[in-house]
Amino acid sequence: MGILKLPVVLIVLCVALNHLEGGGKPTESHQMEKRKCGTATCETQRLANFLAPSSNKLGAIFSPTKMGSNTYGKRKKVEILKREPLSYLPI
């Protein structure tokens, strides 16, 4: 039952966010307004920006993780050198 509620909650949040963003005064400048993107990717990105736990204006602050090159293992140099070059790159 909780799985069915998640899409409904996301849709409600998207609608609320769109309502909040569009509620400002119309601009009276001579510059063109940026056209609003309505694709699913844009909506998802807008929702993520809205929900990001950040209080500064520089962007989201992500906590550091302990992921390094040893987490998944390093590439072996021999395997990299044996690969064929990509055919779509001009040489």
UniProtKB/Swiss-Prot annotation:
Disulfide bonds join 37-42. GO terms for biological process: amylin receptor signaling pathway. Residues 23-33, 78-91 form a propeptide. One of its GO terms (molecular function) is receptor ligand activity. Gene3D superfamilies: 6.10.250.2190. InterPro entries: Calcitonin-like, Calcitonin/adrenomedullin, Calcitonin_peptide-like, IAPP. Residues 1-22 form the signal peptide. The modification Tyrosine amide is found at residue 72. Its main location: secreted. Pfam families: Calc_CGRP_IAPP. It comes from the Eukaryota. The mature protein is largely unstructured in the absence of a cognate ligand. Can form homodimers. Interacts with IDE and INS. Interaction with INS inhibits homodimerization and fibril formation. Amylin/IAPP is a glucoregulatory peptide hormone that plays an important role in the regulation of energy homeostasis. Selectively inhibits insulin-stimulated glucose utilization and glycogen deposition in muscle, while not affecting adipocyte glucose metabolism. IAPP function is mediated by the CALCR-RAMPs (AMYRs) receptor complexes. Amylin can also bind CALCR receptor in the absence of RAMPs, although it is more selective for AMYRs. This is Islet amyloid polypeptide. The gene is IAPP.
